[in-house]
């Protein structure tokens, strides 16, 4: 009797795991289908940063531009200028306030920078996240316990119109981005080429080197 009960519980666990994996695969496929419907667009964004207790600690504005596959640019204009650019192979982050550029490979950066997924169909990128769907909201959670990210939410309708996205860090701080003035087409590939500004310090995480232009 005990053996039969043990086998039944094991079978139930396996069925539950298989069902969860199937649901996750369905959610990934649906999110990718929606993202792929719009190949390029440009939008303004409003950013709201909240503490782990829900208190607003900062707000910002900027421009978000995407060109599939694998290209995106997030240009924050206020309250402090900074720039994130994916050129398809590398992810560049420029902090103008401290005049520093950090660069990493997209493959290594995707675990902490899920924005990459908005333009990527690379299975190795998506395999780093568990994905669930609730209507037009998709919740992505990194599988790695080493990630600084706890959760990434994407709000996108069935026509592929991205409404916004948000991140929740391990410490509970959240960043909400709401898109507006969305326009499709006419996004130049030159926007996704990055050159280190003169005088800026370069922190090259691809090889762990630091240099100054």
Swiss-Prot record:
Transmembrane segments: none annotated. CDD domains: LolA. Gene3D superfamilies: Lipoprotein localisation LolA/LolB/LppX (2.50.20.10). GO terms for biological process: lipoprotein localization to outer membrane; lipoprotein transport. InterPro entries: LolA/LolB/LppX, OM_lipoprot_carrier_LolA-like, OM_lipoprot_carrier_LolA_Pbac. Residues 1-23 form the signal peptide. Keywords: Chaperone, Periplasm, Protein transport, Signal, Transport. GO terms for cellular component: outer membrane-bounded periplasmic space. It is found in: Periplasm. It holds the Pfam family LolA. Belongs to the LolA family. Participates in the translocation of lipoproteins from the inner membrane to the outer membrane. Only forms a complex with a lipoprotein if the residue after the N-terminal Cys is not an aspartate (The Asp acts as a targeting signal to indicate that the lipoprotein should stay in the inner membrane). NCBIfam families: lolA. Monomer. This is Outer-membrane lipoprotein carrier protein.
């Amino acid at each position: 009797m005990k053996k039969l009960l043990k086998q039944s519980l094991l079978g139930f666990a396996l069925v539950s795991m298989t069902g969860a994996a199937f649901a996750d695969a369905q959610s990934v496929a649906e999110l990718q289908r929606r993202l792929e419907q719009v190949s390029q667009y440009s939008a303004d964004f409003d950013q709201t940063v909240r503490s782990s207790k829900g208190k607003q600690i900062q707000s910002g504005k900027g421009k978000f531009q995407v060109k599939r596959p694998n290209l995106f640019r997030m240009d924050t204009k206020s309250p402090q200028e900074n720039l994130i650019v994916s050129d398809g192979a590398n992810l560049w982050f420029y902090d103008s306030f401290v005049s520093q550029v950090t660069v990493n490979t997209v493959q290594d950066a995707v675990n902490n920078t899920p924005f990459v997924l908005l333009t990527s169909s690379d299975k190795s990128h998506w395999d780093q996240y568990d994905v669930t769907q609730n209507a037009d909201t998709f919740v992505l959670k990194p599988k790695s316990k080493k990630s600084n990210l706890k959760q990434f939410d994407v709000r996108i309708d069935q026509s592929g119109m991205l409404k916004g996205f948000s991140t929740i860090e391990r410490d509970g701080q959240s960043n909400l981005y709401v898109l507006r003035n969305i326009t499709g087409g006419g996004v130049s590939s030159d926007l996704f080429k990055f050159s280190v500004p003169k005088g800026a310090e370069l922190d090259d995480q691809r090889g762990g080197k630091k240099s100054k232009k």
